[in-house]
């Protein structure tokens, strides 16, 4: 019988789940998009991807007893590449949403909120989110942050008789920060888990506004029919949480403690509840 790559990955996962000593010779192909520091970024000296996701994947591979090969994949192509079998799973801090769960399954490994950043020199514009009603705000169009801001703006700006936020799409978070530096926007919206790192490498440049909103989970994307791989990833992550390796990686990459998941989750639910 001839198997397609996706079918082989599922078969391999079932065998690994059934036999604790079993290991597949085939590498797991892991997709990622290096434009989200410090979760995943490109080292300018080597051109290689580095960051939390890279170290996290290495620990997962060691725990699972498999080898992984990274495949740089544009963010918008991560789900299609998973569906066609070009990837076994992906790591790119993608938000776990009900809409996306129609197409894949998430093993959640981080959590984050949405927070505004402004130039420190322009922080006098306001200290609360409401102060930015009517202002121009950049956000990555590849994420659900734009929808979150528009929803918040409808509720807290429009309903209060204030002008709605003018949320504009950016190519990614790097582009959004560039628009802010060039004074093309008044603020930018960023996942809160990445802000401490950005403030560390660009000291004094950016200031946060108010507290994060809309905390949500971010997950590893896995094919919905590859239940064995979902379980293997969930079990490996739980072991890393239990023995402290997960917390050590968060600290290494300066991710805030609130970014940690309390337990290994699947589709934002405890795996035991599925």
Please name every model-derived segment:
Residues 34-36, 111-118, 199-238, 255-274:
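Periplasmic-binding protein-like
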Residues 35, 45-48, 95-96, 119-124, ...:
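Short coil/turn segments
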Residues 43, 57-64, 145-169, 199-203:
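Ligand-binding cleft/hinge of the Venus flytrap
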Residues 26-93, 102, 169, 232-233, ...:
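Extracytoplasmic small-molecule ligand-binding "clamshell" domains
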Residues 77-80, 94-102, 148-152, 181-215:
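A ligand-binding cleft/hinge motif common to bilobed small-molecule-binding domains
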Residues 54-63, 122, 129-144, 219-258:
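Extended ligand-binding regions for polar small-molecule ligands
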Residues 58, 62, 67-131, 206, ...:
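Acidic, polar ligand-binding/catalytic clefts
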